[in-house]
A protein has these predicted regions:
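Acidic/His- and Gly-rich active-site-bordering loop/insert found
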Residues: 2-103
Length: 103
């Protein structure tokens, strides 16, 4: 099946400009330092803000088969788990984090 490369690039640019870049800018705007660099992270609440921001972004993507859950343990930073039903055999695990470290 041949793809129209110009249309694919156009769609990619639209998604980047319309969804990814604004969301990334909003994410970067939240300080959300790692607990190692912000001992009062629970009181500051920025890690919770980032989790909520990311959950809203995930909700807006409309990805079929996607589910997520936020796990909290007292005294530990929250964990966001995202699952997407696959279309083939096997599993993939991707790890990332939403906190930041100062430069």
């Amino acid at each position: 099946m041949a793809h129209d490369m110009d249309r694919l690039l156009e769609m990619s640019d639209e998604i980047w400009e319309g969804s990814i870049l604004p969301s990334l800018s909003e994410f970067i705007g939240v300080k959300a330092l790692s607990p190692l660099f912000e001992p009062d992270w629970e009181e500051v609440g920025e890690l919770e803000d980032v989790i909520e921001l990311f959950c809203r972004w995930v909700d807006n993507q409309g990805i079929r088969g996607l589910s997520y859950s936020v796990h909290r343990i007292e005294g530990r930073s929250p964990v966001l788990l995202i699952s997407v039903e696959g279309s083939g055999k096997g599993e993939i695990i991707f790890y990332s984090h939403l906190d930041k470290q100062p430069s």
